Each structure stands twice: as structure tokens, then as C-alpha cells.
Amino acid sequence: MRKLSRRLRELYAKVEDRPYAPLEALQLLKETATAKFPESAEAHIRLGIDPKYTDQQLRTTVALPKGTGQTIRVAVIARGEKVTEASAAGADVVGSEELIDEIQKGRMDFDLLIATPDMMPQVAKVGRILGPRGLMPSPKAGTVTFDLPQAIQEFKAGKVEFRADRSGIVHVLFGKASFSAEDLLVNLKALQESIDRNRPSGAKGRYWRSVYVAATMGPSIQVDINALRELKLAEAA
């Protein structure tokens, strides 16, 4: 077993093995973000789903009201006037078939890929490259659309795509550890509501199993699920 550094031992000692009230958990997250670089705030949520069944898969988006604290590079694959439209709307990388060819050759200088529906048959050719990186455009994620200005604006403003992995766990960055605990709570609440709103039709039994938050290099902190779900928006704002 790897030996923990003194810094990590001290951080782990601050966290009790119990569910914390949401705001208390986020205050503790900030307190344990002591790395020498700007840490992100992460949520790790275990759901009662088995994604090997199509009716128990979760892939959707959430608009984080307080943003992500990150600058993301958006790429768009379109044709004709939609290329000009995407550039004018602030896309960082724009192209048609030639961009697909560049991706096939290894180009990956973007964090998010949006495509117009008419380009999806061509985009499918690089699905094996994009899929494992979580970059394959999807209607569910809002990344297959003709309304490019709105999609670009939303993702740059803090809209985040997420999915449950094969174990039914959702991993999401929901802000920076430098955000106030109150702002992190607003974002975490928005994430919880999106997960509830998009509950897979085949999910049976207890949907929410556990919620943990952590700074990038910090210990995991358990959040009281019921307290988070019962929290009113006015309290979180």
C-alpha cells in the first residue's frame, strides 16, 4: 500500500466517516484544498443503475449556475453557412470534412465537440477515436444541434455533459475549490436536480446510493443525500 504524505494524512484526519450536511461538506472541501495549483471541486455519485441495460443508462447535461471556473475550447463540425455561424458564435475550432480528417490523424485540441445533425454520418467515422475520450456528439448531451450559437454559448457559460460509467457512478467537476462554499452548493444542487430529472426509465429500487465530494488532491467527503435533495433552491442561492 502506498504511504500517504504528511499533508494527505493531515487532510484525511480532518474528515470524519459520516455524511455531512451539504454546505458543511463543501466548506470542508475548501479547507482540504491545499495543493500548490488551483484545484477543482469534484462530485462522485453512485446510482442504483446498471448501465449495461440501455434503459438504465444516464448521459445528459447540467447548466451550472455559477459556471465551471474553466475556459473550454469548443470545436464544431458543420457545413455551409453553419461554419460561419459557429465561428461568429465563438467556437474555437470549426470545420467540415477536413476537420474530421484532422481528427482521424490525431488532432484533439478541444474539450467539447458539437456537430450539426447532417454531419453525424461523417462524424461516425471517427467515433472510435472520439468515444473513449467522451467527445462523441450526442443529441442527449445537446451536442448534436443546428442551433449552434445557443449550444456554444451554453457550454462556454458552464453547461457540463456527464454520464454514469459502467459501475453506475457519475464523476463531475462542478466548479473550482476557490469558489465560495455557497456557490459550490448552488452548482451541486443543480447537478442533483439534473440527475433526478433524467432518471433512467429502467432504474429500480433506491436510485441514490452515495454522494462524495472532494478537491482534486483532497480526501473524499460524504454528503447527506437526503439533505441535498430536500434543500430548497432559495436556500442554495
From Swiss-Prot:
InterPro entries in the record: Ribosom_uL1_bac-type, Ribosomal_uL1, Ribosomal_uL1-like, Ribosomal_uL1/biogenesis, Ribosomal_uL1_3-a/b-sand, Ribosomal_uL1_CS
GO cellular component: large ribosomal subunit
GO molecular function: rRNA binding; structural constituent of ribosome; tRNA binding
A GO BP annotation: translation
Entry keyword set: Repressor, Ribonucleoprotein, Ribosomal protein, RNA-binding, rRNA-binding, Translation regulation, tRNA-binding
UniProt keyword rRNA-binding, yes or no: yes
The keyword Repressor appears for this protein: yes
Family recorded in the similarity comment: Belongs to the universal ribosomal protein uL1 family.
Job of this protein: Binds directly to 23S rRNA. The L1 stalk is quite mobile in the ribosome, and is involved in E site tRNA release.
Assembly behavior: Part of the 50S ribosomal subunit.
Name of the featured protein: Large ribosomal subunit protein uL1
Organism: Thermosynechococcus vestitus (strain NIES-2133 / IAM M-273 / BP-1)
Organismal lineage: Bacteria, Bacillati, Cyanobacteriota, Cyanophyceae, Acaryochloridales
